[in-house]
């Protein structure tokens, strides 16, 4: 039976050790966190001097890759040059912080929402994202950036596999960029994971390559196929349902990846319970 690397998105309050204790409490073997505030301010809780020891402790405890989530405020596809420049600089700083964790032997990725073109058109937006990532990697390149599959809300770029492939093709150092597969977003974008799992995986492989998918955001969907809503539901309580998640955790290609829950904490034990539920679905 395959052991899942799984956990949720955790608060950084209290610093590195408190972060790990929260993971222990939910029974996790992977997790996500924001490296700075949602508005982009650097975190006072995450002292860079403690990053290497944190990474060494995770490695010693057998954790799967961390999937750190960049703040939503970053928009590499935006019109505002000052905001775009901030996103490039801040993402490079995030990579520098996380490089110490990776140097200690613990794999870590940083996940980003690719960006929104805000009326400039998807082609322009995708080009700007590629160019922005190239600038980021000129400053710092010790950690892989994962582009998240998006639901297609508003002017989001990355609303389908082909757009993500276009962005990745524009990145000069291909080894620096991969993909996070968000189950809710992929369904909401119009890919029928519920009824055509194999077909969706073939499309993903043809457009991007399954080997470039490095992490999974494990979320059910409130509104479902083609809704473009991006509204997460708790596991088994949405349009995907338990049969889909059973298929996912028994797919040898996908089940080896770190799985991050981004579902609503309805009770203090929601994520602990969902982690146990998903592990219980493994054959």
Curated annotation (Swiss-Prot):
It catalyses: Endonucleolytic cleavage to 5'-phosphooligonucleotide end-products. InterPro entries: AP_endonuc_2, AP_endonuc_F2_Zn_BS, Xyl_isomerase-like_sf, Xyl_isomerase-like_TIM-brl. It is an enzyme of class 3 (hydrolase). Its cofactor is Zn(2+). Zn(2+) 1 binds at residues 69, 113, 148. Binds 3 Zn(2+) ions. Zn(2+) 3 binds at residues 185, 230, 232. Its EC number is 3.1.21.2. PROSITE patterns: AP_NUCLEASE_F2_2, AP_NUCLEASE_F2_3, AP_NUCLEASE_F2_4. Belongs to the AP endonuclease 2 family. Endonuclease IV plays a role in DNA repair. It cleaves phosphodiester bonds at apurinic or apyrimidinic (AP) sites, generating a 3'-hydroxyl group and a 5'-terminal sugar phosphate. This is Probable endonuclease 4.
